[in-house]
Structure formats: structure tokens, C-alpha cells
Amino acid sequence: MGIKKFFKIKPPPEATPEENREYLNELGISTKTTPSNRREKFAAYGKFANDKVKSKVYAPEGYEQYANPGAQPSERQQLDDLNNSPYDEVSMINNRNASASARHTGNYVDPYSNDNASPYGNSDSSPYGNASASPYDTGYNAPLQQNNNPYGSMNNSYSNKSYGSNSYSGDTYASPSPQASSSNNNGATGQRPSNPYANMNSQDPYGTNSYSNSGSVNAYKGFTPNVAASDVSSRSYASPRHSTSATRSNDREFNFERSGADDEIDLNETIRPEIDNPKGVQRNGNGDDDDLNNSIHENEGIGTPAKGYQTFEDIQKESQRAEQQEEDEEVDGIKQQIKFTKQSSVASTRNTLKMAQDAELAGMNTIGMLGHQSEKLNNVERNLNLMQIQNRVADDKVSELKKLNRNILAVHVSNPFHSKRRAREAEDKIKLQRMQDKQNQEDITSTLHQSTKRIENAMSSGHGPSEVRDRYQNQQILEKAKRYQFENDEEDDEMEMEIDKNLDKIGQISGRLKKLAITTGKEIDSQQDRIKRIEESTDDLDIKIHVNTTRLTNIR
């Protein structure tokens, strides 16, 4: 039975962290305190860096979404997804219902059906009628065709049109009727026909124009029927097949009265250049085109008739006018080129300014994250310094414990004559150690202050431009831009000012980028030195803790 158990001696109760901290403070030993009023200046950049970090998912390819099913998308991802809309599901349901209901109606259009682009359907010029003969023109659930027989249409030229005047009916021997000819030739009143024999009916079956009475077919504007041709065609439908010979004999008769009336020229009629001379052909004063017996001096001095020749002055004026026009066109081209170049310069400066601003923002984010990293390194240095102080106290306590735990017969008595000197040496040692600890703390604080000041100076944008400076700067820009301007207007001045200001901003941003780059390099070098010191202090502290642990295990 041991003495401790015999006398019922129990170890003292373990002190709480608060009691231990108060006891260490009474002894003059530094302890860790967490002030509530301390704020980190670059905490926002640390949160920004944490948001940018992507969590590693160890899952096979294609199964990443099942590795962490409870994870919710971040707030930034939700903000960046501009395609999400609360009405997407509603619109999808409505579109699905609309497409389902359209399939049961007759107006449904199958997107996979062939378009009705058959050359044999829906045209009067088709010999197969209006109905499309293609079996692929009908789509899924499309309404049925009324008549799918390609030879049963009402407009079939082989069943309804026989020797009609329509050129597309296939009869090249059909000639226009007198009524159609008169209606076509007398359409423009007061105009003298260029061919006096155009109104005569041709006796040659091959001389008639098979396309004169037919409706004009335009591939882009549809089919425009001719009224006269339709009348003749309708009459030809009613006439029997054997009546064509009588019609041809009647057409051979020449109507001299009508032809003479068409050939008469009204000499009292006023000359209208836009009708008689549509193409700007020069004529003499009498209005005759082919009369070579007229004198060029016949109407000289009467009004201002058109001359049949050009004088030297007219030729010179015309050449000057042409040169002036060419010069004006060249000037206009140069103006357009100048304007286009300035607009391109404005766009280039805008793009460059935007990229410079993005680079500056990225640099500021980088140096801000370096500031947050500096604050974290400062916390590590403070904790490491406190660990060194407490490890030194632990070393003293281990030595004292070893002295108290030795044999009871080993009596240790200090020299009473040196007591004052020992006390003085102990006080000096405590003072020196305390001064050294405070110096280490001040160095750590000074390093953090220098790093923070360096980063804040790099992130400061400087003073903004004042109104007076802007006003005088605008005047200076306009004065300097006059040598690059030609007939400048307000828009031109605005482009010049924008180009100059954008270039000025780009220069300022370039200077700040250089400052950010230099500061970032200095900060990285400083933090590398601090990390090296932390590594060395950590290794030294690890060795000391290991020695104290070994000494405690050797105490029996």
C-alpha cells in the first residue's frame, strides 16, 4: 500500500482554461486573447476566393451529380444563369398542349411534310391543272385534297382549252382576235405607234406572237391574267373545232379605215418629251426623227429648241461638270472613310478600355486576396510566437518538476550568500525575455501594417478629374484634333473627345496595372520570407516540444 493511498492524498483538480489564463497572466506569461473589435480589412476577398474554389468530386465520369446530391448551387451560379425564368415550365406546358390540340384540327402543318413546290401544280400554265399530282405533298393529319386526279382539273388544257389564244395551251397556230388587238393597241391614247403595221392581223400562222395575249406570268408576283386574252379564250372555248377556218379567213381581211386612223399624225398636238422621247433621244425642232431634209438653223432664235450639236463651251462645261462631280464623289468617299476610321477607332478604344478595366479588376482581386493571405499569415505568426513563450514556461516547469520528484534523501540547499545575486539574475532574465517577446510581437504587427499599407496604396485609384479640368481638357482636345478633322460637326467632335478620353483612361489604367504588378511582386516576396520564418520557427518549436515531452516521460 502506497503512502499516498494510506494518507488518502488526491491530485489537485485540473484548472479550467479561464483559470489557467488568469494564473499565467499573474505570473507575467503571455496568453492568447481574441479581441472582439478586431476587423479584417480583406475578409471580403477571402470570401470571394472561397466562392471561386471548386470542390473536388471523386466520382466516375458522368456521375458527378450523384456524388454530392444534397449540394445546392451557389448564389453566384444562380445569378450568372440568365436563361432561367420562372415561366419556363408554364411556357413548355402551354406549347405542349397547343401542339397536341393542333394535331386534331385540319390546320395542322406537319414540319416533316414536303412543301408544295411541285412545278406541275397550282398554275394555269401547267398542263396538268391546279391540283398537285405529287403524293408526297400531304403531311401527317393534313386535310384531304378535293381532287387528286392530275387529269381531272377544271383548268386542264387538254380537256377544256382547244386551240385557244392562250400561249400556254399548246396551240401555236392560234391568232389573236381583232377585239384583243384593238384593245391592246389603243390602250395608250395620244401616242403614235412606232410600227404602223402592228395593228394588222398577220396571215402567217407562224408570225403571230403566241405570248401577246397570254397573261403575264411572273415567278415572284404570281399570275396576272390579260383581260383581252381571257375574253378571247372564253370565246374560243365556246366555238366548235371546225369554226377555226372561218375565223382565220376573217382575220386575213385588212381594215384600211382603222389602219389609216392610226397612221394619222395630229400636227396641232403638243410635243411631250416624256411620251414621244422616253429614252432621252435628241431630236430636232420639228420633232421628226428620221427627216434628214430639215435644216439645223430652221428654228434658231425661236424659244430654246434642242440643238443637234454641241459647242466648245458646252463640251467644256460638261467636262468641268464631270470633273466637279468626280471631285465631289472623291471628297465624299474620303469623308466616309474618315468617319468609318473614326468610328472604328472609337470601337477599338472602347474594347481596349474594357479589357484594361477587366485586367485592373483582376489585378485588384489578386492583390486583395494577397492582403487576406497576409492577415492569415499574421495570425499564424502570433500563435506561433505565443506557442514559443508557453513552451519556454513549460520547459521551466519540467525542470522544477524533475527537481521535486527526485529522491527524498537527496537534499538540495542553495547557497545563502548568493541569494540576492540569484534573485537579481532571475529578474534580469525575466525582463530580457519579456522585452524580446514584445519585440517579436511588434515585428509581427509592423509586418502586417506594412503589407496592408502597401496593398491599400496599390488599390487606391487616385483623385478623380474635376469639372474645371474636364472643361479645359475638352477645349485642348478639340484644338489638337483640328488637324485630323475635315468639315467637322458635333458628332465628329464627340468622337474625337471620346477617343482622347479613352486613350487617357487606358494610359491611367496601364500605370495602375504597372503599380499593381510591382506591388504584387513585392508582396509575394515579403510573404515568401514570412513563410520561411514561420517554417523555421515551427521546426524549432517542434524540437523543443519533443525534448520536453521526452523529459516528462523520463520522470519517475
From Swiss-Prot:
Residues 151-186 have a biased composition (Low complexity). Signal peptide: none annotated. Keywords: Coiled coil, Protein transport, Repeat, Transport. GO terms for cellular component: plasma membrane; SNARE complex. Gene3D superfamilies: 1.20.5.110. Residues 249-261 have a biased composition (Basic and acidic residues). Residues 1-20, 64-307 are annotated as: Disordered. InterPro entries: T_SNARE_dom. GO terms for biological process: exocytosis; protein transport; vesicle fusion. Residues 74-104, 113-135, 187-217, 231-248 have a biased composition (Polar residues). Residues 339-401, 493-555 form the t-SNARE coiled-coil homology domain. PANTHER family: SYNAPTOSOMAL ASSOCIATED PROTEIN, SYNAPTOSOMAL-ASSOCIATED PROTEIN 29. This is Protein transport protein SEC9. The gene is SEC9.
